[in-house]
Amino acid sequence: EEFGVDESIASFVLPLGMTINMDGTAIMQVIATVFIAGCAGYTVTPGQLVVVALLALLASVGTPAAPGAGAVILFTILSGMGFVNDGALLAYSLILAINRPIEMLVTSLNVVGSICVAKSEGLLKEDVYNK
C-alpha cells in the first residue's frame, strides 16, 4: 500500500508476475550463450540464435527466484544447443565466477519489467507512489 499497489494485487499478482516475468533472466541467458559459443569456437547462426532465444524465454518462465538458478538454466541451454566442449565449459566457469553481480543487474531488470507492466495496466496509484 505504501507504493500505491492494491493489497489484492500485491498478494496474488506480484508473486506470480515475479516468477513468470523474468525478462532480465532471458536476456542474460541469450547473451551468455552467445558469449560462451564465441569463446568456445562455435559459430552461432541466425537460426540457432532464434532457438537459443526461445529456449531462454521458455526457461526463464520456470526459473525459480533463487540465487544461482540462472546458471543452472544456462547450462541446460548450452547442453541443448550442443555447446559442451572444453572451451565452452571454461567460458561457463567464467560466467559462474562473475555471476553474483550479474544476478543483481538481472534482478533489477526483472523488477523494472514488472513495474512497467503494472504501470501499463493502470494498477499503480501514482498519487500514492509519488509521495
What would you call each of these model-derived segments?
Residues 21-22, 106:
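Alpha-helical transmembrane segments of multi-pass integral membrane proteins
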Residues 1-5, 19, 118-124:
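Helix-loop junctions at the membrane interface of multi-pass solute transporters
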Residues 30-131:
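Transmembrane alpha-helical segments and their short flanking loops
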Residues 1-16, 42-46:
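Membrane-embedded helical hairpins/re-entrant loop segments and their flanking transmembrane helices
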Residues 22-32:
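Helical hairpin unit composed of two closely spaced alpha helices linked by a short loop
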